[in-house]
């Protein structure tokens, strides 16, 4: 069988022209394009990772910046609080009291030149309208009386049960000592008298006797802890001086 070329397919030189189907070429191109999408690198994942890293770095930078600002302020505050007195503490601080002073009811102090000051000498205790000195010196009753007089005071005169409670509370803290008070009598047969000459009333407290055959005339009075006794006036003992003042 002889091949007869189609004259329409001959070119100028007499060669036959070949025509391929364009649809197959298009299909190949599409497939290759789709294949390139599947085989493309994971750039989206890389972009997400880089974004997260940037966010973490930003958060760290903010935290470090906040700490850098806070530390100088806190250091300055600690210096002010640690080495300089607080004005609030100066305004609201109150003077401390000794245990002996805390056990009594405080009284109003006298104002002098705008400053509160005590109306009592040092080592004396204020109670109500009097100053009290619990002297540790061991003297006879007469010697204790003279000592109080030299200090511008007298051996204590107990006028009320409230004052008695105050005295008992003070001397109870010194259970090894007894204290002379301003109560005596010239002889056993006469009533007890205070230093100012007033008569003692047994309604206030009772005086326990220490009279014996060897010591029949204890004509002075002292207090030991919470009990009041008569005693020989010559026995050395501590004493309580009292000085009254006007408010």
From Swiss-Prot:
Subcellular location: Cell membrane
Entry GO CC: cell surface; plasma membrane
A Pfam entry, by short name: Lectin_C
Sugar-bearing residue positions: 91
Residue ranges that the UniProt entry lists as topological domain Extracellular: 66-247
Region called Disordered, residue ranges: 81-105
PROSITE patterns according to UniProt: C_TYPE_LECTIN_2 (PS50041)
Gene Ontology MF: a single term: metal ion binding
One example of a Gene Ontology biological process annotation: detection of molecule of fungal origin
RNA-binding as UniProt keyword: no
InterPro entries noted in UniProt: C-type_lectin-like, C-type_lectin-like/link_sf, CLEC7A, CTDL_fold, NKR-like_CTLD
UniProt xrefs under Gene3D superfamilies: Mannose-Binding Protein A, subunit A
Binding-site residues for (1,3-beta-D-glucosyl)n, renumbered to this chain: 146-153, 195
Modifications the protein undergoes after translation, according to the UniProt entry: Phosphorylated on tyrosine residues in response to beta-glucan binding.
Alphabetically ordered keywords of this record: Cell membrane, Disulfide bond, Glycoprotein, Immunity, Inflammatory response, Innate immunity, Lectin, Membrane, Metal-binding, Phosphoprotein, Signal-anchor, Transmembrane, Transmembrane helix
Residue numbers on the Cytoplasmic membrane side: 1-44
SUPFAM superfamilies in alphabetical order: C-type lectin-like
Residue ranges of the motif ITAM-like: 15-18
Binding partners and assembly: Homodimer. Interacts with SYK; participates in leukocyte activation in presence of fungal pathogens. Interacts with CD37; this interaction controls CLEC7A-mediated IL-6 production.
PANTHER family, per the entry: C-TYPE LECTIN DOMAIN FAMILY 7 MEMBER A (PTHR47218:SF1)
Protein name: C-type lectin domain family 7 member A
Organism annotation: Macaca mulatta
Name of the coding gene: CLEC7A
